[in-house]
Amino acid sequence: MRSRPTHSMEATTVAVAVALALAAALAPTPARAQAPAPAHQIAEAVQAAPAPQRADATVLGFRADGSVVTLREGANELVCLADNPTQEGWSVACYHESLEPFMARGRELREQGVTDSGELAQRRWDEADAGTLAMPEKPAMLYVMTGDRFDAASGTVANGFLRWVIYSPWATPEDTGLPTAPTGPGAPWLMFPGTAGAHIMITPPPPGGPGN
């Protein structure tokens, strides 16, 4: 079992809220809207992935009842998740397959009624520390794209904005040389240092404003 540094409740709550906002597509909730056709979901989901990796990525989408379903089995290392039609806004994500146990556990906990963002993170961190939840053994990538909507006809995202997250479980500033807060637009920094959920955030400057 790994030891984990303690964090103030306020700092943990704020940090968890930011992380979950970036990965909103990763946590399905009970359906309130009709799910788009599978072809539409596949086309939108892969928008978060680098272009050379889109065609062979595994794609997860949503059934009419809001549950997650595999829409396409892939042939490379990426898993992409379509926009959740039950949530406001538009967001898709792609991540390395080694992150699937962590992501799937988050979806499972939400289906079990865990809705608090802090508890959702802490439960998974505790399980990872105990060795019951597999985490990546090497740095693993998560791509998160947000936007206004996906236009299937043109295959483009209106006002698309892509963020990069590199999961590096239990990484610390001492291990990486990274700061634990943003230092400027687009500058990398380490979020949740020392925890199973430690990851490097890279947020480019959005059009018309600074990033972090």
Annotate each language-model stretch with its function.
Residues 1-11:
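N-terminal secretory signal peptides that target proteins for export/translocation
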Residues 13-27:
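Bacterial N-terminal signal peptides
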Residues 29-33:
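Sec/Tat signal peptide C-region and signal peptidase I cleavage site
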Residues 34-212:
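Primary mode marks residue(s) on the alpha4-beta5-alpha5 output face of response regulator receiver
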